Structures are given as structure tokens and as C-alpha cells.
Amino acid sequence: MQGGWSQRQACRQLDLPERRANRWLRRREAGRLADAKPGGSPMHAILEQEAEAILAVFQEWAEVDRSHRKLAHRGSYLGRFWCSPSTVRRVLLLGDKHFRPRPQPGKSVKSPFPDWAALVPNSIWIYDSTHFTACSMTVLIIEDLISRKWLTHLVSVEETHTQVQNAFTAALEAEGLLENALQRAGTGQVDPGAEDGLNPILLAVSDNGSQMISRDTRTFMTLLAIAQHFGRPSTPTDQAWIESLNGTIKTEWPYLLAITDPAVLRAELDVVQHAYNSVRLHQGIGYVTPNDEHEGRGEAIRQARRDGMAKARLHRLARHRAERENQPNPRTP
């Protein structure tokens, strides 16, 4: 424009709306040519005294509430401020205020099995109770931890040391261990830590249920030379083997959950126990039945499969090579 151009000509040449040029000129005269701070001024913005009230309540109640959500309700509960939890969180972040995290319990360490407990069948048993609510019954199941054989079960309306004693007595009799257990306990030398001490007949693994840790159960186990091993509280993975068995029973035989007659439940559990031990291939022990593993046939069956797979591969290779040699070669004159 200093060169004689009019404002309209200059705007047309610069492809600039004349209205915008007028606005810039007015802002220059007012000393506001520099860009203002971006963003508007929301009408619902929190007031300065409200932010101060939030920070004050934080100082007083942070150790009690430990959450911006609770602090937002604490403010209205005390009549100090009324705003949303997100607003409280934003004000605290801008004020560099943070809640102190709650102290976390230390991580527990799983207790290993004792060294004398061999990883062979009839050395480590695991047991637990599961519920069938349709008939209001509790089933205590004992499983061999190594072979995964379902040893025995007891259906009862109670969960006491009596059921534990009866179930273990039946399992020891079925496995032919009861007389040996009584004889070993009668020597009075069952002490794996002593130099001349005898090892317990087996290790019984369980959770910390009242019937498992009771004095009567402990006395019964001592009389039969059975050592006890308990998992960590509230840690069902320490008893994953028996938890898996309970889940498998209810998942693969779901009709058991609908039985309302305890006598029918007992009969059906006997049928399911036979199918589980003798028919169903168990993935956890290499796809053999628990009876196979418990009676020592498991490794032979697994080796026979490996040998059969290798033999079948060689047979397929030989067959395909022979068929290829029988085909005429079009390139041969």
C-alpha cells in the first residue's frame, strides 16, 4: 500500500479477504496483533476457589479416601465443593498432587514337596471337596498326583475330618497300602529328617480347608504315617491337579450337576470314575489313561506310539518313492 496500491487492490492481488485485512488493522491499532492463547473460555470452567477447595480436601482426606472418585464425593459430603471425579483428577494433576499407593502384600513363595516324596504313583496324593448344589451334596475326591488316577470319592452332606478319614481309609485299602501304613506308623520311627528314620507312606496335598487342617485330621494322618502338605492360602493353583479334575468332571459330564437324588449321584460318580480312569485319555500324562500310568504301562504306550509314528513315516516314504519310480519319465527317449 505504500507503493500506491489501494487496500482492495492489495487484497485482491494477495487473494486475501478484505474483511480479514480490516480485522488485522483493527487489532494492530489496539496492540493485539499477536496471536491470543488458543482455546476459548468455557462457561462451565471450574472456579479458582473450587480448585483451592479440592486441594484443601486432598490435604485432609487423601490418606483416607486414596481415590479421586472418593475425594469428589467427599467434597460434596462435606459441603466444600461439587464437581465430577474427572475434574478432581485434573486439578490434582495440575497441582502435582498424587495419592500414595496402598501397601501391597509381599509375594508368597510356593513350598516345594519334600525330597523323600518320589515322583511315582502312590507317593503323592491330592484331595479336595467339590459341591453339587442340585442335591446339596459335597464330594471329597482323592487323586494320585503323578498318575492322575481318581482313587476314591465320598459323597456327604458334611465337610469334616470324618469324611477325610473315611475317604483315605477306603483309598489305602483299594491301593493295598493300609496294612503297610499301619505297620510303618507303629514303629514310631517315621521321621524323614532323622538319620535312621523312616519316610512317611505317602504325602497328602491339600488346601487350607478347615477339615484338612483340623487336629483330628492331623492325628489320623500321623497314625497312618501320612505326611501333609498345604498350599498357600487363597491360591488354588497350588492344588491345580485336583482343581482340574473337579472342573473336568463337571464340564465333560454336566448332567451330574442336575442330579437331585444323592443316591443317584453316588451311582453316577462311580460310572464316571471308571470312564475317567479307564477310557478317557489324559492330556497331562501323554494321552494315556490314568490306569495305564498308575499301573506302569504309560511309558510303554507312549514309546509304542513314537515307534509307530516313525515306522509309518518310513512306510509312506517308501510307498511314494515306489509309485514315483513306476511313473514313466517323459524326458527319457
Identify what each model region corresponds to.
Residues S6, P17, H98, A227:
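Residue-level detector of anion-binding/catalytic polar loops
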Residues T222-I226, T248-P333:
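C-terminal domain-tail junction helix/linker
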